[in-house]
Structure formats: structure tokens, C-alpha cells
């Protein structure tokens, strides 16, 4: 039984009695209606015999639909009170209705078809009287494949009951239908065949979608329409429903009537308008191609998307080893990626897909892959698993970077160069000649916002251990990573001094993600590692982009179908980009609130181009292969938006055609397309009707939900349900739809409203066919299934608005290009860029005012200044205060003054994005007592003096901060000539000599402060060796490794892996025991390739560490 039968037969407990009563009624009506049609007279006596009383065993309740006197022309009726038990007077009302109606028609000379219609409507009323709630629901105009229209005058009656919408679907070219442009003139048509079928004993009119009588005549049930803002309102004609939406929900459709009346004046003179607006059309064509050029970020950005897909596939294969990740969506359909919009990924196992067993349990897959991504370092906040949607997906929202213009970026370059020159002239010269942060950038450099150090950091992974790792654990950990990614892929390995954190740098970001997801092994029981990228902003490509991950293959084939269409004409992709921006800014593209998606907008655009003959039709089933094994590439190929070989004449012709097509799109869907009877479909060439798809009757109620009520004229009940179809505001355009004005519901009405609201929230099974767009591959799927009358009228309003705006507004105020203007910046620069001849380099061109990502070195600069100020404040405090008191911190006012004095641009930009507390948190600081600033965690400052060997400083300190007396005293003790204060070391040998000369008699308590000062100098110069960590104290601890051993325990023949020494960063055996040691500023490489298995590696470790008695005790504990 369909939903429509449940709707009208709710409460029926004995279906046999109901059907028998219906058949008896139909039989008696057959005998009584024939004389009435032949003699044009009727009497109550003759019609009384046609009524059969319902069975006395089970008497269901009845509801009669009454209308007020004099309410001719109204299309909707409302419920009255429910009688306790159907009695004989109610049956007499049905008898009188038939006789009085026929008598009224005979008095005014009605035709036989009208009498048959009345007799048929009377039979419908009697047959539907047996269920619990009986409705008089005549059919509205239904879809037909033929354009002719047959209409008759509406039946008027003085009785209590009037049915003003009685139309039946008629097979063939003579069936009743109406077009979108002649809806007001469409009358009511009556099908003689359907009436005869009902007279001959056809079953109840609402029992099924398609039924036949005993004689084989076709029959279609009446079409019902519901409002999408008040789900309890039901109408039998779309005109009445549209008028209801305009009357009751006019606040949400304030501009519909005004814009439609103005736009309709263009219909008779449309060809003349196009001729007069030829210059305007050319102007919009230039603007369209300017938007297309701005969205094309080049082949390099598409390569980033390819690397992100490969990285995600490595994570997914930890869940399903044979699964592959494909890119679909706009990046495939358009062939470009702008680097900002989100990317759609889908996971498919090709073998299982061809076997028919894919996808697996999508909810479990969402949970499993989400857990794997979080283990790989993805944030819990940015990763959003959506497992209870119609299509379960995983959404990733990347953290928004700071936006910076080209002018501000070059200003930062200049200030960074000047500040580096103020610190050290030699360093400034090397920075200007070799550093990518200088203003004199090389011509082959593509990324202006990335330093060499940032690229190194993006390939680095941090492993934080819960316990300190001994030599066996560290060796096993490094070996497990090398076995997963390959020994040649590992470039550097760093361990901190406490052996609880390891950082590894790889050759590519893809290998870094692979190392983040590989299984880790340890020797000690209970040891675990938390894996995450080294830096919060410099990470592999997958971490820094928005993406959606699904598990269905429909999107792959859909995207390649759109790609085939859009790449077939040069104007197709630019126009689709403009319409996508318009749909988002106008609110038409808002699937969260039940509107359309970008996919639906693209289908509308392609359907229009095919209908106009601009592009050829492509069969979705025949021309696009279904198999993904050899026909689809996981990485979409890049295709430039603008052909660089165009001549100025060819470009002008394309611009004129693009402007005309964009203007015609709005006119076509505003006036030419028949939304009442036709469907936007690419499944077949030509026109597709709603009747051919079975979409001419909509699902109006869910199973178990209350029966919808008809409205009483003058007091219509409005139930504002905040369910799936509720209006919750427009997220894209920034405006919200006002809720309909409703009165508070109490008693029975309030109970019905709350229960209906709960049912609407529980189920989204309501499918509407007011706005029909057929999906090319998913069967019986309407992409506009959530759009009712109110949302349809809103979309039509935006079509009218866009059409009028293109004809009368200037480029700065046109609503169609509102989204493109906000994203592309200056209109003049875009127009100038689009007007010239196309060049290959213009595809990736950017306007000066276009925002780009803020370089990470801006935070490094503020971090360096804050660290220096903290060190200076600590030194001042220790010089004035006695020992034993705790350092309170640096004054916040002093820190802000230092920011304004040394980095005003960075400070201003950072404060535009974060407040004071957020910025301090990003810098690794905390506010103490509302006026002092301290590090959140001082790693390596208090423990450094106790555990670090005395006299060891990092090699990157360009100029140790010692007084002249200290320098002279150290030089005199060592017997060497003192170095000049202006001379900075340029090699490791010079730093080693400086360490020997200066640090012989230097007190150990001054070591941490001087190390911090020396480290911040490296940060200010922005050298790659100093930006390996996001926090200065973490960077300090990175080079204090415990791999140093005394010369007595280290020999030249020992394996570096076993002893922990390194040729670059180890201790030179030639140095005396008390001489200061040198640690290289460049993180040391892990020596030795590890291709052995775990058993071989264990034997190797055993052989190396068994040389001392202490190591033997460790081995007995490990292998007991």
C-alpha cells in the first residue's frame, strides 16, 4: 500500500469491509447516473438508491470536507470536527450532494461530460467514506507529453460542498496539461474515460499510483501538493499552493511578485533587448573569462592535489589494503584547482565494486578512517566524521591562515632584510643573495610565501614517546620507520636529550605521511608514541586543505561526465564557475537548508547548453565507462582555462558568446523551461516529463506521521516546523529567511504540531517534485527533492534578479558577480588582465590586492623578539635581585613596545587575526598576574645547567654576548689572539675555535641565558637551521642530544649506531677532556642503513651493547 493510501485510509481496521462498501457504492452509482446524463434531470429519490450504508460490524469514523457558501474559486478545504460515529444523516448528505449537483448542472445547461464528472466526484466521495478520515481530493492538472490544453469552466454550486479542481490524466495527445507561461489561463479538464472507469466499478481512486478498471481503462490518482514551510498544509492544485505560499510566507518571498512583473515585460521584446545590449554582453564575457583566469592556479596546484590524494591513500590502505582513493567533483570537472576550495575524495576497491560488494559498512568505515587520521596527527577539532547522513562522509576543515596582500608581503621582505642587516652586515649580504625571503627573488621561484626551511619542516614528523627510549628502543623505532618508507627516504633523525622525542625528516611529504601511519615497534613493554607533524602550519599537503571523503563510486562517473561536457567548449567552464559563485552568494546553492548543490547547478548549465546546441549530447551510460579499472585516472589531468594560442579576435568572439550564454541561462530557466511538467535531465536527449518518470505525484507524508489537514477558508492553520525543511538562514549570502508569522498553538493543535515536528526531524523521506533535476546515474533521484513551493519560488526570484541585474547594473554592483568580486579583488585589474592577449604565464597571475597566505616566518619574527625580551628581562632581574627568588616574567607592556619597535608590520597583521591572549598562546607564552609574560613550558632551561656538559654552545651562535673583559681574559688564558667583535663565524671550525677561546672559564649559570640570546639571533636572521621547531625552547632542546660520549669510551672503529656518535655532531677525539664541545646547528643524520629484520637488528644491538657489564644486566632484563 502506498503512502497515499495510508494518508486517506488512516485509522481503517477492516480493509475487506471498506473495499466491499466501495464496490457496492460504485455498482449503485452506475445504475443511477446513466438516466441523469441522458435526461439532464435528477431527483433525490433516484439518487438515494445509489447510496449503500457501510457495514454495521465495524463502523469507522468519517470526516466530511465542507466549504463555506460563496467561496467559489478557492482551491483548498479544511478539516472540521471529527464525528464519533457515521450516522445515516451523513449518508444523506452524500446523496443530496450528488443529486443537487446534477440538478444544478441541468438547470444551467451543463454538458454530459460535466454530469459525468459530477457523478464521478460523487462516487469518489462515497467510496472514500468508509475509511477513518474521508477526503474529497479531486485531481489537479497532471503532466503530459503533449502541449495542447483542453479546459472547461469550473463547476459552481450553491450547496455546502464544492469541488473546484477535478482534472484527470488522459492518455494521448489530447490529455490536459498546462505550460508555465499559461498557468493563469488553464481551466479544469474532465476525463470521460476515467469517469466511465469509475462508473464501471474501478477501485478506490487513491489505492495505487496506477490502476485499471475491469474494462482496462487507465487511471491516475489525484495529485497532492504540500507546503515546505508548514508541512500540515495540503492542496490539490499547484496554483493554490503557490498562492498560499505568497499569502502566508510572503516575508520570505518579498521580491518575487515585484521582480516577476518587471521581468515578464522582457519576454515579448527579448530579441530586441539582446541587440541593444550587445556591448553589455561583451562586457560580461570579459568578466567571465577574468574570473576563469583568476581561478586557474596552474599545474603546480593541481600537483599538490595529486600529492594529497596519494597521502590520503596511504592512510586509507591501513584500513583496507586494496582500496584506492579517487578525486572527483569540481577539480575533475573543471580540470583546475584554485588551491582554496575543498577537494572531494572517494574510497573504492575496484575488485569489490565490480563484484557488487562495495561499499562496505560506511558508518564503520567513517569511524575507522577517522581514528587513523587522528593517529596520523589530524586535529580532533578540524576532523568531522558524519556517519548518519544519507551519504556518510568525513569532512576536514583546515585551519584558516592569515591573509596577506602582495604589498604587505614585500614590505615584510624589506623589513626582514633591514633587521637582518642591523644585526649582522655579513649575514644580511648572504641573506639578500641566497635567502628566498629577500626582495631579490630568483625568477624560477614559484612559491613566494615558502622558505626553504618551511619545506624542510613540512617533510618532518615528530614522535613523542610516553617513556624515555633506551638504545634498543630508539634503534628499533628508527628501523621500523626505515623499513616502512625505505632507508633512502630518511634524510635526518633528531633525538632530544631526554630521549622521549624523535624527529625525522624525509625526502618527500608523501613519505612523511607514510611514516606517520606506519606501525611502530619497541623493545620495552608499554612504550607508545604519539605521531604528529613537526609544525602546526608547515605540514604535508593533505593537512592544509579542506576535503570530503566518501565511499561511493557515483561521484567519479558523474565528475567525468561533467568533464566531458565542460571541456567540449571554451565557454562552458568559465560560465559554470560564474554560476557556481552566483548560486552560493544568492543562497540557491545551500544544500544544508534544503536547496540545490553545485552539482545540480552544473547539470542545469549543461542541460541549457545542450538544449541550445552549443555542446553535443553525451550519453551517460554509453559514453562514460562504468569500470574504474583501466578507464579512470585517480589523478585528474590539468587543463588550462584559457587557450594561450587565441588571437585577440578569437578571444573577443569567445567573450561575446560567453556573455550571451550567461544571459540566456537566466532567461531560459525563468521563462522558457516548463518547471511544472518537465525535468532537467541528461539521461536522454530531448525533453523529459515528470509523468514519464512517475514524478507527477509527490510523497507528502511519512509513515507514522499525523495526517495533513486541509485549510479552512478564513482560518488556515499554520504549523511552523523546524524540521528538515525548516529555514535556518542562508550561510553563504549572510541573510536569513524570516520565519512565518504563526500564532501559538495550544491543546490539540499544539499536540499535532509537536508530533509532526518530531516526525519531520526523525525522517527526511518526504520527496517533492516542484523543482526536478534528475541525477544521471542514481535511479529515481531528484536533486531538488527537498525544494517545495517556497524554495522553488525563492530560486525563481533569484533567477529574475540575476537576469535584471545583468541588464541594468554595472560590474561593481551586479549580483551575479558578487561572489567573484569578493574573491578576485579589484575589478579593473581583472578586466585589464582579461582584455589583453592570453599568455601562458597569465593563468597563474595574481592581482596585487589578492590575499595570500601569511608566511610562517611572521610568527617566527615575533617569537624571536619575545624570546629575546624574556632573556633580557631574566638577566636584569637576576642582576638586581638576590638568588633564590623566582623570575616573575617580562612585562606585557615592554613586550608590546618591543613588537611595535622591531616588527610593527608583523604585530599589526597578527593582531588582526588573534586577540592578545590568542597571540601569546601561538607564540608559546602565557600571561601571569595580568601583566607578566612567561613561557608556557620552559623546556631545557632549568635542567640545562644541571645536565648539559659545561662549555657547550650551539655552533650557530654568530656572536656570543660577552663583555670585552671576558673576551680578553679568555684569550689570555688560552694563549690565542682574540677575535674581532664585528667578525661572525662562518664555518664550524671557526665556531669550534671560538668555543675553545671563550668558554674555558665561563660560569655555567650564565649558559642558558646566553644560549637563548644566541638562538634568537638565528631566528631574526630567518636561517633554515633556526626554524626547525615552532617554539624556541623546543628548538634549544633539539640540539642537546645525549649521543655525546667521553673520548675514552668512543673509538674510531665503533659503529655510530651503537655508540650514538655522529661524524658531524659528535665529539672530536683530539680535544682535551675539559675542552668545550661543539654541537652542529644542522640536525645530524642518522648513520647506517637499516635493512635488517627485527631479529637481525636485535642481534646487532646485542653484539654492540654487550661490551660493558652494565649492558649485560640490561640484556638479562630484556631477554629473561
UniProtKB/Swiss-Prot annotation:
<keyword id="KW-0808">Transferase</keyword>
<feature type="compositionally biased region" description="Basic residues">
    <location>
        <begin position="60"/>
        <end position="70"/>
    </location>
</feature>
<feature type="binding site">
    <location>
        <position position="230"/>
    </location>
    <ligand>
        <name>Zn(2+)</name>
    </ligand>
</feature>
<keyword id="KW-0809">Transit peptide</keyword>
<feature type="binding site">
    <location>
        <position position="584"/>
    </location>
    <ligand>
        <name>UTP</name>
    </ligand>
</feature>
<feature type="compositionally biased region" description="Low complexity">
    <location>
        <begin position="17"/>
        <end position="59"/>
    </location>
</feature>
<keyword id="KW-0507">mRNA processing</keyword>
<feature type="binding site">
    <location>
        <position position="249"/>
    </location>
    <ligand>
        <name>Zn(2+)</name>
    </ligand>
</feature>
<keyword id="KW-0496">Mitochondrion</keyword>
<keyword id="KW-0863">Zinc-finger</keyword>
<keyword id="KW-0548">Nucleotidyltransferase</keyword>
<dbReference type="GO" id="GO:0008270">
    <property type="term" value="F:zinc ion binding"/>
</dbReference>
<feature type="binding site">
    <location>
        <position position="227"/>
    </location>
    <ligand>
        <name>Zn(2+)</name>
    </ligand>
</feature>
<comment type="similarity">
    <text>Belongs to the DNA polymerase type-B-like family.</text>
</comment>
<feature type="region of interest" description="Involved in oligomerization">
    <location>
        <begin position="800"/>
        <end position="900"/>
    </location>
</feature>
<feature type="binding site">
    <location>
        <position position="244"/>
    </location>
    <ligand>
        <name>Zn(2+)</name>
    </ligand>
</feature>
<feature type="binding site">
    <location>
        <begin position="598"/>
        <end position="599"/>
    </location>
    <ligand>
        <name>UTP</name>
    </ligand>
</feature>
<feature type="binding site">
    <location>
        <position position="342"/>
    </location>
    <ligand>
        <name>Mg(2+)</name>
    </ligand>
</feature>
<feature type="binding site">
    <location>
        <begin position="555"/>
        <end position="559"/>
    </location>
    <ligand>
        <name>UTP</name>
    </ligand>
</feature>
<dbReference type="InterPro" id="IPR043519">
    <property type="entry name" value="NT_sf"/>
</dbReference>
<dbReference type="GO" id="GO:0031123">
    <property type="term" value="P:RNA 3'-end processing"/>
</dbReference>
<feature type="binding site">
    <location>
        <position position="580"/>
    </location>
    <ligand>
        <name>UTP</name>
    </ligand>
</feature>
<keyword id="KW-0547">Nucleotide-binding</keyword>
<dbReference type="Pfam" id="PF03828">
    <property type="entry name" value="PAP_assoc"/>
</dbReference>
<keyword id="KW-0862">Zinc</keyword>
<feature type="compositionally biased region" description="Low complexity">
    <location>
        <begin position="207"/>
        <end position="217"/>
    </location>
</feature>
<dbReference type="InterPro" id="IPR054708">
    <property type="entry name" value="MTPAP-like_central"/>
</dbReference>
<feature type="region of interest" description="Disordered">
    <location>
        <begin position="1"/>
        <end position="156"/>
    </location>
</feature>
<dbReference type="GO" id="GO:0006397">
    <property type="term" value="P:mRNA processing"/>
</dbReference>
<dbReference type="InterPro" id="IPR002058">
    <property type="entry name" value="PAP_assoc"/>
</dbReference>
<dbReference type="GO" id="GO:0050265">
    <property type="term" value="F:RNA uridylyltransferase activity"/>
</dbReference>
<feature type="region of interest" description="Disordered">
    <location>
        <begin position="196"/>
        <end position="221"/>
    </location>
</feature>
<feature type="compositionally biased region" description="Polar residues">
    <location>
        <begin position="7"/>
        <end position="16"/>
    </location>
</feature>
<dbReference type="GO" id="GO:0051260">
    <property type="term" value="P:protein homooligomerization"/>
</dbReference>
<keyword id="KW-0479">Metal-binding</keyword>
<feature type="site" description="Important for catalytic activity">
    <location>
        <position position="548"/>
    </location>
</feature>
<feature type="binding site">
    <location>
        <position position="548"/>
    </location>
    <ligand>
        <name>Mg(2+)</name>
    </ligand>
</feature>
<dbReference type="GO" id="GO:0000166">
    <property type="term" value="F:nucleotide binding"/>
</dbReference>
<feature type="short sequence motif" description="Nucleotide recognition motif (NRM)">
    <location>
        <begin position="773"/>
        <end position="782"/>
    </location>
</feature>
<feature type="region of interest" description="Disordered">
    <location>
        <begin position="1047"/>
        <end position="1076"/>
    </location>
</feature>
<feature type="binding site">
    <location>
        <position position="330"/>
    </location>
    <ligand>
        <name>UTP</name>
    </ligand>
</feature>
<keyword id="KW-0694">RNA-binding</keyword>
